[in-house]
């Protein structure tokens, strides 16, 4: 019987390299000016494209409108979205592969009651990058938290980031095996 081992040569190594090189945009790297919906989708698709190469329109205006209707993000002001809304949408786009929209709203509510939004967002970015490193490289998940103070809330962020990384790992390797649609 032939083994179903993925090709660990070029394709798998490229994939691993892409995941290890991925860097989340930090809060201060997001546009400081307000953006229209089409500019938001362009920015989000740009930020997320390294995680899902070749996937067109990872984020659409209809999705954004849905998140506003479900009160996961605040509605735009004069049809424009600010930096915080963009950061929230970025997190939603990552977390929606693992959690329901209701769960994402709850996660964000808990974090913003505990930490200023900018700090909570940047912490999620750091933890996601660490989770990608551990998941796609070392498989060592014992690295200490990057939180200045470990709390149940910071561990919730850390677990969420690990969930996203594990989902990406599973998705990517199923593709390499040729078993995912």
Residue ranges of each PLM-predicted region?
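Intrinsically disordered, low-complexity, charge-dense segments enriched in Lys/Arg
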Residues: 107-181
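Basic helix-turn-helix/winged-helix DNA-binding cores
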Residues: 2-112
């Amino acid at each position: 019987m032939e083994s179903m081992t993925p090709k660990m040569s070029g394709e798998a190594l490229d994939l691993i390299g892409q995941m290890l090189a991925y860097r989340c945009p930090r809060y201060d790297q997001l546009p400081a000016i307000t953006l229209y919906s089409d500019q938001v989708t362009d920015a989000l698709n740009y930020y997320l494209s390294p995680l899902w190469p070749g996937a067109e329109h990872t984020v659409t205006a209809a999705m954004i409108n849905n998140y506003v209707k479900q009160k996961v993000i605040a509605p735009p002001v004069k049809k424009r979205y600010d930096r915080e809304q963009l950061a929230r949408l970025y997190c939603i786009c990552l977390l929606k592969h693992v959690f329901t929209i209701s769960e994402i709203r709850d996660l964000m509510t808990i974090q913003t009651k505990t930490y200023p939004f900018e700090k909570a967002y940047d912490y999620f970015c750091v933890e996601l990058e660490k989770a990608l490193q551990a998941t796609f490289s070392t498989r060592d998940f014992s690295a200490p938290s990057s939180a200045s103070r470990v709390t149940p809330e910071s561990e919730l962020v850390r677990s969420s980031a690990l969930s996203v990384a594990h989902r990406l790992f599973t998705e990517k390797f199923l593709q390499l095996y040729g078993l995912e649609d």
